[in-house]
């Protein structure tokens, strides 16, 4: 009985902080609280019986709850011959909160019917590939980043992905990013990622010669004064405080 009233609370709440608080309450009941598997099923039942407009409003909750049941609903929408339902399903999967849907996104990018679908799905992959996620270890996340890079066809897409790659704080990520310092079109995001990785002193100190060489390259390459300052400080073993 609790879930339908919580769902009604989400739909009644004005956009903004109140709506977000209502959404968090539903997600907590359906993912963490005692009896959450039954609550998640109750939410899916509420979602299925909701109007199209209400389903649209509940999309982010559906994605945040995730799981096989939610993905089944989304896959049914994507497979629908109704173009509006397919678009709705693609929007839902593109909002998924973690990388569990990555293989499905890769598959869907390959089957995209037009550029808009491809852009939506690839954008979702670029967003989730490096996300902190307890369902994928760092090596698998980096593999997903590499797989996503292979799907990118524009430097703007590659730039977004390279900038985000530094969220995977490993030496293997550093080794993946460094060669892009030599590519003029992608040197800027590579500089940013190298510096972000160098921010982590343990990682930097464990591979000092490699980081020193890469930071020298950043200083010689970037036109961003803040990156030059940071790279210089990290080379000297100093810290850097992010400006508030």
What are these regions (language model features)?
Residues 9, 25-32, 61-64, 68, ...:
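Core register positions within helices of long alpha-helical scaffolds
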Residues 152-154, 168-171, 189, 201, ...:
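Long beta-sheet-rich domains in secretory-pathway and surface-associated proteins
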Residues 14-15, 50-51, 81-82, 113-114, ...:
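Short inter-helical turns and helix N-cap capping residues of alpha-solenoid HEAT/ARM repeat scaffolds
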Residues 14-34, 38, 48-57, 64, ...:
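Beta-propeller blade termini and top-face loops
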Residues 124, 184, 190-194, 202-203:
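Alpha-helical protein-protein interaction modules
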Residues 1-12, 33-48, 56, 67-79, ...:
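Amphipathic alpha-helical scaffolding segments comprising HEAT/armadillo-like alpha-solenoid repeats
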């Amino acid at each position: 009985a609790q879930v339908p009233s919580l769902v009604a609370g989400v739909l009644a709440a004005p956009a903004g902080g109140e709506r977000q608080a209502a959404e968090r309450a539903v997600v907590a009941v359906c993912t963490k609280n005692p009896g959450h598997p039954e609550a998640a099923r109750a939410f899916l039942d509420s979602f299925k019986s909701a109007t199209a407009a209400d389903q649209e409003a509940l999309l982010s909750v559906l994605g945040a709850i995730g799981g096989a049941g939610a993905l089944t609903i989304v896959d049914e929408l994507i497979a629908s011959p109704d173009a509006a339902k397919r678009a709705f399903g693609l929007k839902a999967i593109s909002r998924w909160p973690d990388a569990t849907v990555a293989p499905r996104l890769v598959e869907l990018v390959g089957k995209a019917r037009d550029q808009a679908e491809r852009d939506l799905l690839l954008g979702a992959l670029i967003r989730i590939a490096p996300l902190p996620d307890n369902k994928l270890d760092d090596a698998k996340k980096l593999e997903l980043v590499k797989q996503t890079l292979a799907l990118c066809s524009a430097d703007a897409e590659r730039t977004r992905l390279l900038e985000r790659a530094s969220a995977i704080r490993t030496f293997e990520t550093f080794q993946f990013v460094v060669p892009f310092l030599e590519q003029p079109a992608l040197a800027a995001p590579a500089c940013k990622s190298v510096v972000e990785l160098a921010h982590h002193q343990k990682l930097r100190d464990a591979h000092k010669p490699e980081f020193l060489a890469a930071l020298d390259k950043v200083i010689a390459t970037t036109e961003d004064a803040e990156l030059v300052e940071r790279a210089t400080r990290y080379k000297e073993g100093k810290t850097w405080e992010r400006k508030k």
